[in-house]
Amino acid sequence: MADQLRTLPKNAKVIYEHCLKQIPNSLSQQDLVEAIGASISVNDLSSALNILLSRRLLDPLRQGNVLVYRAVRLDEAKTVSTMEGDEQIVYSFIKNSGNEGIWRKTLTLRTNLHVSVVDRCLKSLESKNLVKSIKSVKNPTRKIYMLYDLVPSTELTGGPWFTDQELDVEFIENLKKVIYRYVHSKSFPPKKAAMGPDLVWGPEYNGYPTALQIHNWLRSTNITKVDLSLANVISLVDVLIYDGKVEKRSDGASYRAIRVNNENIDAFTESPCGNCPVSDICDANSRVNPITCEYLDKWLN
């Protein structure tokens, strides 16, 4: 394949080398004119592009209504050159789907090939470790195809919260507990028996953690082997906020834990009846009774 590069006309070689540097980005003909300059005429540029396309060193793509070109590495071009025509078509559509992949049914519709031909091509490409099939957490019955060496998008895998296409509730709950304990440790002074458990920091305290600090702390402790992104950590803190365990401070960046009351609450004392001064004469057959009690009615509603 290196011989093919050496035998390229000068203009085609210049264009190809420039496109290689832009991978994974694509370039329009106008982009090439602006990058290479006036050294190549429009006619020579078109001829060079046709040569590169014929040797499968460029992939033609569309971005809206604009035709663009993306370089194909030499080793991949060599692999593609050994494929049959139908295989090349199927491979091209799978490649262009990126890490979002493409559903087998969609692939059949877009290639306009018979389903048996598509299946044969897929089987061949999988046997060569050029493409792979994965399952989507949103549509577990669908087979999604993408290039073999690509990492599926979180839209397909569900990100770190899913294991084998199942929501890992235990993993999420354990991480929430760990993060809450960390935020709590930064939100209140150490307990001192003589001063009681409800100590708080003064207004000058600036040790409340940000999402980035929580993220860095998680990574430094190796609590989990799963590589969590900053966005993942923020989503967990948001859940803790909804749970009423953490609040975002007025600075908009740091977080403070909310003390959780773990004492057992007597449901009777929480109701109006537990504090009613005439509860001893309240009776279903009395003038003071639960049916006509406006306080109990409001509390129940």
Swiss-Prot record:
GO terms for cellular component: cytosol; nucleus; RNA polymerase III complex. GO terms for molecular function: DNA-directed RNA polymerase activity. Keywords: DNA-directed RNA polymerase, Nucleus, Transcription. One of its GO terms (biological process) is transcription by RNA polymerase III. SUPFAM superfamilies: Winged helix' DNA-binding domain. InterPro entries: RNA_pol_Rpc34, RNA_pol_Rpc34-like, WH-like_DNA-bd_sf, WH_DNA-bd_sf. The keyword Nucleus applies. Its main location: nucleus. The keyword Nucleus applies. It is found in: Nucleus. Component of the RNA polymerase III (Pol III) complex consisting of 17 subunits. Interacts with TFIIB. DNA-dependent RNA polymerase catalyzes the transcription of DNA into RNA using the four ribonucleoside triphosphates as substrates. Specific peripheric component of RNA polymerase III which synthesizes small RNAs, such as 5S rRNA and tRNAs. Belongs to the eukaryotic RPC34/RPC39 RNA polymerase subunit family. This is Probable DNA-directed RNA polymerase III subunit rpc6. It comes from Schizosaccharomyces pombe (strain 972 / ATCC 24843). The gene is rpc6.
